[in-house]
C-alpha cells in the first residue's frame, strides 16, 4: 500500500507527495516557436521601455539635482546600488558589457554621494515618477504589473545578481509607477540571462556591442577605438540571443497561461508606444 503525505506551499496550496502526475508548464497549447517569439517580443519591448527612462535627459537632470555631479555616476550607483557595498571591480563584472575601468570609477563617484542603498532608492523613485508622468495613458498597466510580478516570483535568482537585488525592492502602489518598476526588474532578469549566455560564447563585450547596435553604443558604454568587430562570431551571437529567448520562454511558460503570454507581449508593446508618444524629445 502506498503511503501518501501532503506538501504545503504558500502559492500553490497542498499536494499529495505520492501524486505521480507532474505539474505541466502553464504555457502549454502554444508551440515552442510561438512561445519563444512572444518571449522575445516582450523582452525587446521591456528593454526599450526601460531604456527610455534610463537614457532620458530628464533622468540625468534629476540625478544631478539629487547630488550626482556626473549623472552617469548616478545611473551606475543607482542601478547597481542593490548590490550593496561592493567594489567598483565587482560592479563592473556584474554590469558585464561596460568598459570596466570607467565603470568602476563611476561607481566610486556615485556611492560617495548617498551610499549604495541610498542611490538605489533614489533611482527606484525616479523610475516610479517617470512611469507616473509618461505611462499613465497606456492600456493594461495593472495587467503588466500583475503578470510581471508572477514571472518575477518564479524566476530563479542564481547568477543574475541585479535581478536578485531589484526583485525585493518595494513596488509603488499606483499602476503607472508599478508597471514601469516591474518592467525594470524584468529587464534585469533578461539582461542577466543574456550576460550569462554571452560569457559562455567566447564573444567579448566589445564584440557583442558591435554585433548588436554598433560603434555608437560601443562608445556610449565606454569602450575606446579601435573596436573589435567580431564579424566572424555572428552565428555565435545569434545563438546567444536564441539561448536567452529560449530561457525566458521557459520561465514565462511556467508563470503564465498561453493567452497571457501573448497578452503581455501586446501590452508591453503598447506601453512602449505610449512612452514614445508622451516622453518629450
Across the structure, where does each feature detected by a protein language model lie?
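N-terminal amphipathic/basic-hydrophobic helices that include classical n-h-c signal peptides
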Residues: 1-26
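A composition-driven signal for long, intrinsically disordered, charge-rich low-complexity tracts
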Residues: 5-6, 14, 206-208, 212-216, ...
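Charged, low-complexity surface segments at secondary-structure and domain boundaries
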Residues: 14, 112, 249-252
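Phosphate/adenylate-binding glycine loop and adjacent helical scaffold
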Residues: 18-230, 274-281
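Accessory, usually C-terminal, subdomains that scaffold auxiliary metal cofactors
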Residues: 216-281
Amino acid at each position: 500500500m502506498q503511503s501518501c503525505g501532503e506538501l504545503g506551499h504558500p502559492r500553490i496550496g497542498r499536494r499529495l507527495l505520492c501524486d505521480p502526475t507532474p505539474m505541466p508548464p502553464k504555457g502549454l497549447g502554444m508551440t515552442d516557436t510561438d512561445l519563444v517569439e512572444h518571449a522575445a517580443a516582450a523582452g525587446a519591448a521591456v528593454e526599450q521601455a526601460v531604456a527610455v527612462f534610463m537614457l532620458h535627459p530628464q533622468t540625468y537632470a534629476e540625478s544631478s539635482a539629487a547630488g550626482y555631479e556626473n549623472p552617469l555616476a548616478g545611473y551606475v550607483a543607482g542601478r547597481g546600488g542593490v548590490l550593496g557595498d561592493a567594489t567598483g571591480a565587482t560592479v563592473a563584472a556584474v554590469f558585464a558589457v561596460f568598459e570596466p575601468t570607467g565603470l568602476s570609477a563611476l561607481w566610486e563617484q556615485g556611492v560617495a554621494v548617498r551610499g549604495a542603498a541610498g542611490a538605489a532608492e533614489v533611482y527606484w523613485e525616479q523610475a516610479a515618477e517617470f512611469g507616473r508622468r509618461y505611462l499613465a495613458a497606456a492600456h493594461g498597466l495593472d495587467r503588466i504589473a500583475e503578470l510581471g510580478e508572477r514571472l518575477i516570483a518564479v524566476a530563479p535568482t542564481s547568477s543574475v545578481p541585479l535581478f536578485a537585488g531589484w526583485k525585493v525592492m518595494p513596488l509603488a502602489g499606483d499602476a503607472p509607477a508599478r508597471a514601469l518598476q516591474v518592467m525594470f526588474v524584468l529587464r534585469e532578469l533578461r539582461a542577466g540571462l543574456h550576460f550569462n549566455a554571452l560569457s559562455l560564447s567566447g564573444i567579448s563585450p566589445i564584440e557583442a556591442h558591435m554585433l548588436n547596435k554598433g560603434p555608437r553604443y560601443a562608445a556610449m558604454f565606454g569602450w575606446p577605438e579601435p573596436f573589435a568587430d567580431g564579424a566572424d562570431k555572428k552565428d555565435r551571437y545569434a545563438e546567444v540571443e536564441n539561448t536567452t529567448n529560449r530561457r525566458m520562454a521557459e520561465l514565462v511558460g511556467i508563470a503564465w497561461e498561453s493567452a497571457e503570454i501573448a497578452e503581455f507581449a501586446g501590452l508591453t508593446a503598447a506601453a512602449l508606444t505610449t512612452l514614445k508618444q508622451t516622453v518629450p524629445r
